[in-house]
Design a protein with these regions (language model features):
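Beta1-alpha1 glycine-rich phosphate/pyrophosphate-binding loop at the start
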Residues: 3, 7-76, 152, 164-190, ...
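Phosphate-coordination loops involved in phosphoryl transfer and adenosine-cofactor binding
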Residues: 6-8, 82-83, 150-152, 207, ...
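Residue-level detector of alpha-helix initiation sites
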Residues: 15-16, 39, 120-122, 160-162, ...
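A Rossmann-like FAD-binding core segment of flavoenzymes
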Residues: 73-103, 108-111, 171-269, 309-313
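A structural signal for the hydrophobic beta-strands that form the central parallel beta-sheet
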Residues: 80, 116, 140, 204-206, ...
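FAD-site-proximal beta/loop scaffold in flavoenzymes
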Residues: 121, 126, 132-148, 245-295, ...
Length: 314
């Protein structure tokens, strides 16, 4: 039996936090393996124009940032594996070599330290039957799927920055965009809110929630709305429903292993250290007052440096 190589750092997640962590780890002379179920980039892949990333006055496409981060990580020697982590075991008595074993769907990975950078996933639309229509008109990624609805009618559900960004993008390809928000005003930042001014094909529906997703022949044909103030119902006919109502951390597989807060985020200090020595957190998956690409990148660098210091002390 061939003994598997033990990696210095296994990084779970290849979003901006995970990829940055791998860059800093590899540059520090540590072996780094990044596990990513989907394409490298995380939520960067859903950003058409990243306008608040320092150094790009006109913004930059999220795909471009993701590609550059991956190329940079691989240039310094990080290895990106197409796999999904499903569990992690901690060898409490082993402070050195194989302290952690991360079990993936494809393989298992022994490591001296681990950085969790799995980010957060979109909250599902809380409507019966909506999940079955994902890929059939319901989408959680406007930049991924928006072009399929060129010159058609679409609906965006949500009122935060992500929802507004979706509206702006979709207004350029769709015939009409209906924005549905359960409040009387946007939650989005003032700068984002101003982006809606002057969009001629936008229709807003305030104080409304989606109570049903309508379908014909197995595809979305519209939604039914319920006004939360008056109780009145109405119907919007559309072929696409883009959901942007929030995110939740991908941490169920870590329950009982490491401390999580009441919302499921990994509790971590400024350097990313968690309640388990040698286990670090970076990006949207951790407790933090701000979840942006720029903070995820910073988290990744800090977690890698903290992991390197931990390994040096073992």
């Amino acid at each position: 039996m061939v003994e598997k190589k033990i990696t210095d750092i296994v990084i779970v997640g290849a979003g901006p936090a995970g990829l940055t962590a791998s860059i800093y780890a590899a540059r520090a002379g540590l072996s780094a393996v990044v596990l990513e179920e989907l394409g490298a980039g995380g939520q960067l892949l859903s950003i058409d124009n990243l306008e608040n990333y320092p150094g790009f006055p006109d913004g930059i496409n999220g795909f471009e940032v993701a590609y550059s981060l991956q190329a940079q990580a691989e240039r310094f020697g990080a290895v990106i594996e197409s796999d999904k982590a499903v569990s992690i075991s901690v060898n409490e008595g082993n402070s050195g070599d194989s302290r952690f074993v991360v079990q993936g769907i494809q393989d298992s990975y022994s490591a001296r330290s681990v950085i969790i950078a799995t980010g957060a996933k979109p909250d599902p639309l809380p409507v019966d039957g909506a999940d079955a229509l994902v890929g059939k008109g319901v989408s959680y990624c406007a930049t991924c799927d928006g072009n399929f609805f060129r010159n058609r009618d679409v609906i965006v559900v949500g009122g935060g920055d992500s929802a507004v960004a979706d509206v702006v993008y979709l207004s350029r390809v769709a015939q009409s965009v209906h924005l549905v928000h359960r409040r009387e005003a946007l939650k989005a930042s003032p700068w984002y809110a101003r982006q809606l001014e002057g969009i001629g094909n936008l229709v807003t529906h305030w104080s409304c929630v989606v109570s049903d997703v309508l379908q014909e022949e197995g595809r979305v044909s519209g939604v039914q709305l319920n006004n939360v103030l008056t109780g009145e119902t109405s119907t919007i006919r559309a072929q696409g429903v883009f959901v942007a109502i929030g995110t939740r951390p991908d941490t169920k597989w870590l329950s009982g292993i490491v401390e999580l807060d009441e919302s499921g985020y990994l509790v971590a200090d400024e350097g990313g250290a968690t309640s388990v020595p040698g286990l670090f957190a970076a990006g949207d998956v951790r407790t933090t007052p701000l979840r942006q690409v720029v903070t995820a990148v910073s988290d990744g660098a800090l977690a890698a440096e903290a992991a390197a210091s931990f390994l040096a002390s073992c």
